[in-house]
Amino acid sequence: MWPLSHRHLCLAFLLVCVLSAISFFLHLYQDSIRHGLGLSILCPDRLVTAPVAIFCLPDTPVSPNTSSPCPQHPASLSGTWTIYPDGRFGNQMGQYATLLALAQLNGRRAFILPAMHATLAPVFRITLPVLAPEVDSSTPWRELQLHDWMSEEYADLGDPFLKLSGFPCSWTFFHHLREQILSEFTLHDHLREEAQSVLRRLRLGRSGDRPRTFVGVHVRRGDYLQVMPQRWKGVVGNSAYLREAMDWFRARHEAPVFVVTSNGMEWCRENIDASKGDVMFAGDGREALPWKDFALLTQCNHTIMTIGTFGFWAAYLAGGDTVYLANFTLPDSEFLKIFKPEAAFLPEWVGINADLSPLWTLAEP
């Protein structure tokens, strides 16, 4: 037998090292497949756990001024929760905030569906990741319809794969996370700057002075004109309510200006008294593209709302004082079975009772 030379020994050692490295990486790859890490190819800088897949929507920038569909979840969270996106802009804001809060409370990962991302991401710097449609369709969901207030059972939901539904928009779900919610619903810079530019141009009509206080006014009209009286035995805010709400602010704030937005701007111009020179009809009333109106409202100091989730969220994000329309249904309304005023309006907000006389007139034989 030929004695091994020093060169042969070195080559043998290198061969053993190469084989060991191949074995190690093969084992690592197999382990990653078992634990779902192969799905991270959709977001190559993130790791996700099977059967969850997240993907970065096309044409989504990754600058600080954008929402991120591929954030990293804390390692302590598990499972997959999502919520069915239903309704319009304010409804989906409520669904997003509720999903985020309940998932955190139960130690679960929260994901939104592409339709919700398409609604909210153009406006806000949201961070919840997006669930791929094929994963949504193949996940063994348990479904749970939420009512619109926090309940004890929602704090102890053991389901690892849960799809929520409903129209939750109650502060009782998420107010303990207020700073996080405000961060999630931070406007993109261009929307905030455009809204502030509009406000900077406003002047008080009589003096020409710049306003000291901006009060956003959201007047919900549209489909509520039929839905409230016919289905819910309720009313929308009328001109008397808006006058009283404005007088409340005039008595408490120096030189306010009222920035009116609505999906019924023509009605507002005809029914809101602007003779004092402190009412500005600034909204464009485009229901399909509500971003500009919403941004305007959130950049004001205070809020007057009538009814609806759009007005709620404008007030919640703006902070300051909020006046809302209170007791806007008859006592026997079916609406009160799904809506609790004490869970809908923050305790410090100020309610002004609605005029229900049109409903009594309708009820007369």
Curated annotation (Swiss-Prot):
Lumenal topological segments: 26-365
GO annotation, cellular component aspect: Golgi cisterna membrane
GO biological process, one term: olfactory bulb development
Main enzyme class: transferase
Catalysed reactions listed for this entry: a beta-D-galactosyl-(1->4)-N-acetyl-beta-D-glucosaminyl derivative + GDP-beta-L-fucose = an alpha-L-Fuc-(1->2)-beta-D-Gal-(1->4)-beta-D-GlcNAc derivative + GDP + H(+); a ganglioside GA1 + GDP-beta-L-fucose = a ganglioside Fuc-GA1 + GDP + H(+); a beta-D-Gal-(1->3)-beta-D-GlcNAc-(1->3)-beta-D-Gal-(1->4)-beta-D-Glc-(1<->1')-Cer(d18:1(4E)) + GDP-beta-L-fucose = alpha-L-fucosyl-(1->2)- beta-D-galactosyl-(1->3)-N-acetyl-beta-D-glucosaminyl-(1->3)-beta-D-galactosyl-(1->4)-beta-D-glucosyl-(1<->1')-N-acylsphing-4-enine + GDP + H(+); a neolactoside nLc4Cer(d18:1(4E)) + GDP-beta-L-fucose = a neolactoside IV(2)-alpha-Fuc-nLc4Cer(d18:1(4E)) + GDP + H(+)
Principal cellular location given in the protein's record: Golgi
Membrane topology per record: Single-pass type II membrane protein
EC number, UniProt record: 2.4.1.69, 2.4.1.344
Domain of life the protein comes from: Eukaryota
Transmembrane annotation, as ranges: 9-25
Recorded GO MF terms: alpha-(1,2)-fucosyltransferase activity; galactoside 2-alpha-L-fucosyltransferase activity
Pathway: Protein modification; protein glycosylation
Similarity annotation: Belongs to the glycosyltransferase 11 family.
Protein name: Galactoside alpha-(1,2)-fucosyltransferase 1
Lineage: Eukaryota, Metazoa, Chordata, Craniata, Vertebrata
